């Protein structure tokens, strides 16, 4: 199976094109046609080899999760004409990512270990251990940097800097809490804990929409419910479902995206094992078996399905 490294379509009515780290975005009238390529990024670097089926895994998880939360928050999706494509409403994105955390993990745990007891203006209790459940989920927004890394920001700073209006931010907070609640319920049905995740929103006129992907292993962290309490009691690492395994492989091979470091050689075996892990993620998060497309030329299939949908 060929991986989808990139697409370069000329679509009827196309007014623009944007190549993201892993997505190819086509602007067609008031719509976005988003192709989830098989490119993979870690440490803000796109790795040299694409991972077969990765784009399909993320696109299909996001599409299913958007469908399962559409009663909670209106979202951008209009159709999913191909396993690797979503077509939706073109929104003006807010320049903030709404990160919500139910547990002390990842970035929050690193900050806590360094002695910080407030994160984005939110006070954290003493005596927490890494991966402990927080008393209640906390929202820790980050600014969306046009270049470079995103930055943590407090609600007060967001409003003071005029990044978002107070009325809109109140709505974003409500939507974020409601989505996390639904995401937590969906995860529990699959024997998983939704640890933390991020949501992005955009606006058309006065209406706010949920945009981009949600509850995927690239935008979220999941733990397994089974054995969680025992591992916490023993101080053991939690078994997690995310793309952390890719980062771990890179770190073990001397790469963390720092200057002067080279990306390690990705053998066919490594590419194949990452692909299998993504498929496993899909099946665990969604609870259905993954269907591989049979075509030898995925770009041809994708273009045909986009043209039919437009």
Curated annotation (Swiss-Prot):
| Keyword check for Transmembrane | no
> Which Pfam families does this UniProt record tie to the protein?
SAICAR_synt
Q: Which CDD domains match?
A: SAICAR_synt_Sc
| Alphabetized PROSITE patterns for the sequence | SAICAR_SYNTHETASE_2
Q: Which reaction does it catalyse?
A: 5-amino-1-(5-phospho-D-ribosyl)imidazole-4-carboxylate + L-aspartate + ATP = (2S)-2-[5-amino-1-(5-phospho-beta-D-ribosyl)imidazole-4-carboxamido]succinate + ADP + phosphate + 2 H(+)
- List the InterPro entries hit by this protein, alphabetically: SAICAR_synt/ADE2_N, SAICAR_synthetase_CS
List the GO molecular function terms.
ATP binding; phosphoribosylaminoimidazolesuccinocarboxamide synthase activity
| GO CC annotation terms, alphabetical | cytoplasm
Q: Output this protein's name.
A: Phosphoribosylaminoimidazole-succinocarboxamide synthase
């Amino acid at each position: 199976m060929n991986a989808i490294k990139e697409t370069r379509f000329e679509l009827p009515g196309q007014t623009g094109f944007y190549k993201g780290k892993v997505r190819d975005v086509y602007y067609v009238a008031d719509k976005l046609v988003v192709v989830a390529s098989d490119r993979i990024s870690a440490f803000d670097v796109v790795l040299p080899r694409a991972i077969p089926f990765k784009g399909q895994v993320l696109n299909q998880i996001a599409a299913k999760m958007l469908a399962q939360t559409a009663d909670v928050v209106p979202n951008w999706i209009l159709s999913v004409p191909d396993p690797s494509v979503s077509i939706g409403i073109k929104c003006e994105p807010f320049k903030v990512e709404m990160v919500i955390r139910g547990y002390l993990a990842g970035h929050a745990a690193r900050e806590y270990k360094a002695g910080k007891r407030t994160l984005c203006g939110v006070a954290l209790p003493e005596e927490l251990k890494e991966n402990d459940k927080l008393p209640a989920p906390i929202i820790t927004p980050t600014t969306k940097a046009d270049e470079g890394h995103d930055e943590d920001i407090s609600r007060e700073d967001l409003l003071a800097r005029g990044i978002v209006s107070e009325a809109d931010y109140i709505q974003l907070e409500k939507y974020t809490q409601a989505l996390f609640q639904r995401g937590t319920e969906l995860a529990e049905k699959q024997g998983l804990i939704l640890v933390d995740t991020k949501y992005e929103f955009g606006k058309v006129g006065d209406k706010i929409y949920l945009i981009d992907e949600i509850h995927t292993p690239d935008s979220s962290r999941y733990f397994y419910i089974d054995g969680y309490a025992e591992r916490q009691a023993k101080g053991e690492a939690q078994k997690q479902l995310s793309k952390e395994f890719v980062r771990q492989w890179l770190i073990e091979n001397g790469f963390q995206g720092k200057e002067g470091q080279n990306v390690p050689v990705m053998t066919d075996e490594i590419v194949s094992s990452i692909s299998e892990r993504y498929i496993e993620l899909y099946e665990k998060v969604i609870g259905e078996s993954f269907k591989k497309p049979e075509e030898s030329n995925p770009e041809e299939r994708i273009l045909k399905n986009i043209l039919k949908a437009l």
